[in-house]
Amino acid sequence: MTVAIVDFRPDHAAAWAQLNTTWLIEGGFAIEAKDRVAIDDPQGVFLDKGGRIFIAEKDGEAVGCCAMVPTDDGVEVCKMTVTPAARGLGLARRLLEACEAAARQAGAVRLYLETNSALKPAIALYESAGFVHLPPRPTPYERADVFMEKRLQPSRTRL
């Protein structure tokens, strides 16, 4: 078994759409307008804005993903999921670490995310990675009721 975290390529578009649609539906969440745009146009929503999308591959198959996009004061981490069959391999943590490393390299001082209180394993992952809870705030997502951040010290090395 080979697992890897790779940058999004155009040939990942169908897997990106499937991964994100599946976690929303299986979680009992509506696919909101902002979700639809991100699912249908990852290039425009993330990459063209200076963000990154990471894909977790297991034996060459896309089994997870996570995106990051610059914000006014850091980077927002979003659209993280790993298929049920690939859970337990540490891929969600590796995806989150890839986002954090890229954010540090870009000089970001803050990671921010929004999630739902029903997603207990995700919240536990974020807490274990050093994220702290924030007070509720306005959000375009109806499902978002948990807000978290992690303050970063920028990387001292440049690649």
Short names for language-model regions:
Residues 61, 80-97, 101-106, 117-124, ...:
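Conserved glycine-rich acetyl-CoA-binding loop
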Residues 2-4:
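Extreme N-terminal starter segment of soluble prokaryotic enzymes
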Residues 31, 87-88, 110-111:
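A generic structural signal for short
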Residues 7-78, 83-85, 96-98, 102, ...:
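Acetyl-CoA-dependent GNAT
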Residues 8, 22, 40, 109-129, ...:
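C-terminal "cap" of GNAT-fold acetyltransferases
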